[in-house]
Amino acid sequence: MYRQQSFITLDQFYEWRPLSRLEALLSFIDFTLLEQFFRYDPHKRGPKGYSWKCLLLALIAMQVEQIATVKALVQRLRSDPVFKRCLGFGYLDRTPSESTLNRFVSLLAGTDVLEKTFRRMVCRARKLGLVDGANVAIDSSKLTAYEHAVPKSRIPENNPAFPNWGGKLDTNGNFIKWFGWKMHALVDTYSGMPISYVITPANVADMDIAEPLIQKMMDDYDREIHPKYYMMDAGYDKPELYANIYTKFHGQAIIPINWRNTKLPPEGINMEGQLVCTMNYPYVYGGNDNGTIRLLCPHACGKCDCPMGSAWCSPSNTGYVGKVKIKDDPRFITSPFRGTPAFEKLYNQRTSVERTFGDLKDNYNLDNIRVAKMARVKVFMDLSCIALLASRLSDAVGKDKSKAA
């Protein structure tokens, strides 16, 4: 039996085959800032080493292909020549070692070039109409540390870069506890793409990070993104946060009321956080005039059957009409009103941030942290977000080409 000789080379096969999802995704990575940071020095002597671009593509492919460890990534590069060629390496080139990739991760951990690259890609998505920025959702997600868990008594008090213990309620109401970090993300509800994010130890409260995260978004994009509504869960219910979002960022916080240990609401407010009349019926929203809300009598509007009638509050045939300003108390005076379908419709958009976290963890390896120290964890967080954004850009451009065809 004679072995038939192939009529095409491996390079020809690679050029003729259809473009894979990984290659399409990697083609949308913006290397502009990375090329400036890893500038080639022709006068440098010694071994040339590996291409920084190939090393970076290998780390991004590790997140996309959900490869568990750097060691497994090296084994994949050695055993899969097509995968190796997709990342820019030649078939006969030496494969980078595990130590080489770990040193490259440490190099990236000392810079913010990956986060700046992510922001450039967000700006590109905005130009393509993928990111709206009018409504955003904020939430946090747990990341378990790779370090061994230690008791609280052994955690340094003055080290904000050390992992800590955190706890929260899951979707079923069960309390979960973990040792590690939190990823706080601000997500565009229109596209489900993250716009800004930070990492903190797990013991940091969500409400304390919301305002710095919004300020970071404003600074990163030179205030080109102006969200009108900020959707958050009840854990962010903090009076100062409402006021700062309204006065500093000119937006409206959409957050359910969390009374915590309060037994009775303030006067003129019911337990749902709605403004009520003297008979404890919620006022009807009458419109917003440049921050001034008109309050209409619920009996006159047919929303309730008040035993006192509309004459109890006003002799007018149209009933009582009042005015309040949002700036006086943005927590309770909102536009739209709490309890209205418009308010609920806005708040339902908050689930977009949960879907984004699920996408990052299920499809881009964010739930598989195998490095220690906050700066190195941040590198893999950046890589996952860049991979997610590149995937969305690739899908959007591919759909446009299909429609044009």
Please report, for each region that a protein language model flagged, where it lies by residue.
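Basic, amphipathic alpha-helical segments enriched in Lys/Arg and hydrophobic/aromatic residues
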Residues: 343-405
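Basic, short loop/linker segments at the boundary and entry of helix-turn-helix/winged-helix-like folds
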Residues: 19-61, 65, 102
